[in-house]
């Protein structure tokens, strides 16, 4: 079948052949900001509800206001390769979805070592009042709750922008102690090159796997 302007995205479902044109094309659910106003930044796949099928998590922002809002869409595999948008029931509370810069990467890692995949959305912002290091914990059934600001430290240096909340988060086991930690960064300003700080990386260690 042909591509349609009525759809915003597709999954190409392999039939185990190398002929991509013969693969099935499955329409994706529409994003939260209305048709043709969603900007899809990044996606990651994994079995988030432990049913044996691969699901997809998508980071989405909007076109107007430009890149305002950082939304995470949870798409659950029905077992036949079709993805159902379960965000309203599985990840309803998302305060960053309206007033947080929308650019960022999605990572799926088991942050608290409970056997279920959690979501890490690596973003940045200067005014929302939320960390750009966004970690959402899975309850084991594919339902997510974001950890609070108080569960994470502020930046050791607020930087040129005088903003204390964390920018970015790359999940990695830094200290080889089983728990997943992450690397963050100060975000240099660019408005005045004579006053801006230099970017530098710093680590946040998850010492008890208790996110």
What are the residue ranges of the model-derived segments?
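Acidic/hydrophobic-patterned starts of short beta strands in beta-sheet-rich repeat architectures
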Residues: 1-2, 50-60, 113-122, 176-185
């Amino acid at each position: 079948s042909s591509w349609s302007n009525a759809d915003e995205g597709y999954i190409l479902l392999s039939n185990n052949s190398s002929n991509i044109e013969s693969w099935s094309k499955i329409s994706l659910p529409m994003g939260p900001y209305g048709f043709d106003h969603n900007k899809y930044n990044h996606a990651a796949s994994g079995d988030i509800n432990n049913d044996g099928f691969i699901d997809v998590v998508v980071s989405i922002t909007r076109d107007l206001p430009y890149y305002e809002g950082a939304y995470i869409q949870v798409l659950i595999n029905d077992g036949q390769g079709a993805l159902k948008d379960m965000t309203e029931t599985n990840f309803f509370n998302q305060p960053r979805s309206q007033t947080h810069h929308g650019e960022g990467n999605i990572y799926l890692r088991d942050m608290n070592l409970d056997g279920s995949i959690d979501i890490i959305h690596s973003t940045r912002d200067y005014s929302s009042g939320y960390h750009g290091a966004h970690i959402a914990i899975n309850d084991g059934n594919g339902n997510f709750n974001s950890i609070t600001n108080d569960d994470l430290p502020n930046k050791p240096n607020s930087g040129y922008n005088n903003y204390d909340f964390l920018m970015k988060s790359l999940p990695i086991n830094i200290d080889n102690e089983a728990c997943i930690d992450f690397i963050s960064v100060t975000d240099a300003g660019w408005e005045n090159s004579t006053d801006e700080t230099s970017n530098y990386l710093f680590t946040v260690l998850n010492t008890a796997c208790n996110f």
